[in-house]
Regions:
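Short, exposed "boundary/linker" segments that immediately precede the start
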Residues: 1-2
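Soluble catalytic regions of large protease machineries
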Residues: 7-10, 14-153
């Protein structure tokens, strides 16, 4: 059996994954005051992770520890893509609400983190324009140069 603290840790880890997925889009909005379609994959991943939290892993107080994943989660060649649901439209609406709640909560966390670290964000944007990609050491060095620390969320 999962203890409450273990369940909370697992939810926190998944929340962090979603916060990271949303970070690029939010940073783009903060830095350029505009958004592009570049973050479409990140948004898809964030949404899938939030939906999995609700439908597969039972991380929803509203719905409880019930698996609501559909049989179409794994699509095979030659099989039509559809959504055979084993739950009501009302439950589907609650699932959508829970997914939206998780995404919104993670969006707020990502926005807060990026605003609190705006100097680092601006330097990171400059560095990425120059190099396109950076490694973990370069990323962490940005925080050290600006007397910031990477804290646990």
């Amino acid at each position: 059996l999962h203890s409450t603290s273990r369940r909370q840790r697992q939810m926190c880890i998944r929340d962090r994954d979603i916060v990271v997925c949303l970070g690029g889009r939010i940073a783009e909005s903060l830095v350029f005051d505009d958004v592009t379609t570049g973050a479409v994959q990140d948004i898809r991943q964030a949404t899938e992770r939030a939906r999995d939290m609700v439908t597969k892993y039972g991380f929803s107080d509203e719905l409880g520890m019930i698996n609501y994943s559909t049989s179409d989660d794994e699509v095979f060649i030659g099989r039509e893509i559809g959504h055979a649901k084993n739950f009501s439209e009302g439950t589907a609406a609650v699932i959508d609400q829970e997914v939206k709640r998780i995404i919104e909560s993670c969006r707020e966390k990502a926005t807060k983190i990026l605003k609190e670290n705006r100097k680092v964000l601006d330097k990171l944007a400059e560095l990425l324009i120059e190099k396109e990609r950076i490694g973990q050491q370069e990323f962490e060095a940005l925080f050290e140069q600006n007397d910031e620390t990477i804290e646990e969320m």
